[in-house]
Amino acid sequence: MTACGGDSDDPDDGGGSSSSSLAVTTPTVSNITSTSAVVEATATGSGMTSRGFCYSTSANPTISDTKVAGAAAQMTVTLTGLAAATTYHVRAYAQSSSEVKYSSDVTFTTSASSTDDSEEEQTVGPEALNRVSVHDPSVVWDPSTSNYYIFGSHRAAARSTNMMTWVSFTAPWATASSTNAGNAQAFTTPQVTKVKKGGADVDFNFNAFAWSKRGNNAYNIDKNMWAPDVIFNKKMQKWCMYLSINGDNWYSSIIMLTADKITGPYRYQASVVISGFQSGTSYKDTDLEIVIGSQASLPGRYNVGKGWGNRYPNCIDPCVFYDEQGKLWMSYGSWSGGIWMLELDEETGLRDYDVEYKLTGSGDGITIDPYFGKKIAGGYYVSGEASYIEYIGGYYYLFMTYGGLAAGGNPADYNNGGYQMRVFRSQNPDGPYVDSKNQNAMFNSYLLNFGPKENDGNRGVNIFGAYTKWGNLLTGGGYEASGERSQGHNSIIAADDGRTYLVYHTRFQNWGEGHQVRVHQVFQNEAGWLVAAPFEYTGETVKSSQIAKKQKVASDKIPGKYKLLIHDYKLDHTKKACAEPTEITLQANGTITGSQYSGTWSVKEGTSYITINIGQEYKGVMIEQTLEELNNKEKKLSDFTRTPCFTALRSETGVTIWGYKYSD
């Protein structure tokens, strides 16, 4: 196998000469996994037409093979799609019209790792579960500590080595004079007061606390630090926290803080994007003029007063990610004018002020704005928040949560409840994003997109929603036994251990507004759509790559009685409605019988793909899971019930189903 990161089709080896003006440094390789590695080098010189990296399983790769560009003189590229336990050769190169200059050959070996298809023995189960409450959990892996971390609103955070045993902590704030600053002091004075535009330094000093206070004289910062997202910036070699400083009347901003350790302390660097300059001269206190140029007055498209929410975003709920070419992006927004996307500058972690966005559309139908970037979902004050984007198995998946975040049960307030995760996907990081019915994530007018009155065509795959009476856990007493509802504001991680984890907060049927974090494994079905395991993750060993290659549940173990749960749209959250299971039997001859549903089932040979047809065809996966019970701590792994389970999606409707085998 040979490949090359670059952007020229010239096959000439060149070789360079002693008088060459081109120069390349020897690559450094880091963040090596079983399928990827990060390479860095510098390529400079006059007359350069392209630069990049060549890599191969053979020595001294050249540019005569597949190429992907290295963008800047200081190049950082993530090599993906590598084979596990394989030695690769990599060279940096620079090319002009007359020559190609190569660096020395460097080798690295991908890990044999747990992302291969080897079988693992499950060593822990539900006894390892330790619950935490983190609202709006955003998950990230820190290889230096071998921990997963989740960061949420109001400074809630937790860590775990296994996605089950969570330990809470608080990351401190830093200022110039303190490593444990208070909330009211932490966001007033940015460390960065000049930003780059057109190669020049431009003054910008933004007081995030003062901006959000404009929306309400009684403003309390303690209640308005929302939904952070944390990522390690490879260029900066810093942990970067993107934090929403929310304010009333859209006076919000997303700011970036940095730390040397993932646990902090985090210091405020600068704002990334700001909302709420809907009238007067308030825009003078933002970076609007840095982005679009000097203005005699506020441009009319922003001068909309209380109409802001139909057109433009509330700048909260950031999701920051690297695409497969190494470019840094941020999606953001909540209800209001939808979800938007900006390109970030990896050198600074802030918005890339040199990327221009040409105004597209007019009025409330603006889809590209010179300041806010590109709209990818929502709009017209349709519900939707908590965008999260992750690249999984060839697609960028966009998660959003529709509806109101509360537990529901208030017929007089339709927006109280109905929180539900929806899924879209795209082959490009900035869209277009569509659901399994090919419906676009963007709206062209106001529609109601959640609850019993939903009239938007049931947009977005309903990966799962409120449910009760499910499994052993939900047959006893206590709030957990009452069932989950209002699940959402999730994150998702395609982890280095070969599993993909969906992390979300949930409320419960009989616990008011109390909430906890839950984690489910997620798989791709045969059509490449995501389906979630029916029970939370409790140490199961099945890996994402095994689904297409191995039958994880033997055919003779599948037949039997099953509980079937259908996650349909339009549950009446005002009445705290939940999906409840019914009973079916998967017969050994491939038929399904039951009082409500009958049909057929089949497993694709040599895989874990299952097809369930109960009048409508669902495509999913069949795995084995461990059923939780209420008294987990008093048991060991061998005491728990392991049973065949399926999770499947009907692409034509976006409805998902779950099932598990049970004994009377």
Predicted regions and their residues:
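Short, surface-exposed linear motifs at loops/turns and structural transition points
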Residues: 8-114
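C-terminal motif of bacterial Sec signal peptides marking the signal peptidase cleavage site
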Residues: 2-3
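Carbohydrate-active catalytic/glycan-binding domains of CAZyme proteins
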Residues: 112-664
